[in-house]
Amino acid sequence: MRFVKIAIFFIILPYLPYESKAFWGYKITNECRIKKHLFQKKYYLADEKGKMLADGVFEWTITDEYIYGFDGYESEYAVGFIYDRKTKQGENFDHDEFVSECKRLGLEYPSRFDNIYTLQNGLPRVYPLQGE
């Protein structure tokens, strides 16, 4: 009987809602935390109730207005995220959109972001110096 209960648990587990497939996570502010997907090597930004705000957290930066960072795993999907702490909204971006949005908001994007992009795609990112 015990074996049956354990087997049922593992059969049902993959069908749980996406947000529930995580450990408790690391609390980084009063309103959100970084959580790890169960069975994956990926993290995501979640609110206190566990609802996903932005997927793919690899390295992040916290300011008074934003929490932002990037995912170093899948470059063909959204790799950067920005979470607005005032509106409590998060959004994912591809590499170029992420860099543009960081510049638009006056955020300095994480230094390792270009290194991860180079490792995944084999091509370095080149940005013009300020004033050119």
Where is each model-derived feature located?
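Beta-propeller blade signature
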Residues: 83-85
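N-terminal Sec-pathway targeting helices
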Residues: 1-10
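Repeated scaffold domains used in trafficking and secretory/extracellular systems
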Residues: 54-59, 99-112
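Generic detector of ordered, mature protein regions
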Residues: 70-75, 95, 106, 111
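Beta-propeller fold detector
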Residues: 91-97
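N-terminal export/targeting and maturation segments
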Residues: 12-66, 70-72, 78-81, 90, ...
